[in-house]
Amino acid sequence: MTRAMATIPYYDAEAVARATPMPALIAALLRAFASGDYHAPSRLAADMGGASLLVMPAWKGHARVGTKIVTVDPRARPSIQSTYILSDRASGRPIAAIDGAMLTRRRTAAASVLAASRLARPASATLFVIGTGALNAPIVEAYTSAFELKQILVWGRDADKAEAAARAARAQGYPAAAIATVEAGLAAADIVSAATLAVAPLIAGSALRPGMHIDLIGAFRPEMCEADAETFARARVFVDTHQGAMDEAGDLLQAIAAGAIAAAAIEADLAALCSGAHPGRGEDDAAITLFKSVGTAIEDLAAAELVVGNVAP
């Protein structure tokens, strides 16, 4: 026997973008991480032979539960595609279906900037974005919402795509330019944000300067890597979640295996930074800070609640 299911609203990519202005989204993530009310187990990550399948559930007390299904395939365009289902926890009934790809892009960028607001020098003026994929534009949008940037540099393996990304940023009023090498970007940047599917280091620790902040978004599988072991050895290291980092953060795990850093040297996670349990950078202007993220379903749920306009408990 079949039975008709009540229709639930679907929020497409455009609706998600409209509903998640970066200042509001960053604030929503801050509340979620500081509250301790949001919970997420380790995500299921499956290798599909050159591609990845991720299933990410989370819940907020007895109020909400959400699940995101993601595929990541470097051969696909866009490379990240997903759907998010937000449900009422008490009844189990779905409340909304949401474009998970846009939700992921925006909450990922917002989480990085939330961390940077505690770890980067407030006067940081130059952002260097490594990667020209779907995260490039949200990263630029998020950082410009929180820092008074005078220069945004973009690098990608494909120079034409880097120029296109910079041109798109300029069209939005941002002071962006493509550059030819990673080395040139590292030499100029106050903040470096890498969002790639790299399996070999792009960032060399030897090129880092005192006071920089490094934001590593890619390398969400153990075999992936955006920064070399020396990068971690020279930096004060922070993560989005300890469990996620130790399970999946490729470049961090490789640095630990190489003896460049001990797991115990990780200073804090995003919850500690948001709750005030850890002061973040503090007054240490000379420190190199590093935020390694692999993503957490807590971010998805907080963002989904913002999308449907229901952030109350």
What residue spans do the PLM features occupy?
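Short alpha-helix adjacent to the SAM-binding motif of class I
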Residues: E163-A168
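Generic secondary-structure signature for well-ordered alpha-helical cores
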Residues: P21-M22, L30-Y38, P74, S117-R121, ...
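Adenosine-phosphate binding glycine-rich loop
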Residues: C225-P313
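Residue-level signal for well-ordered, solvent-exposed loop/turn and beta-edge residues enriched
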Residues: S91-R93, D160, A260
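Rossmann-like adenosine-cofactor binding region
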Residues: Q172-A257
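Glycine-rich adenosine-cofactor-binding loop
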Residues: S112, A123-A146, I152-K161
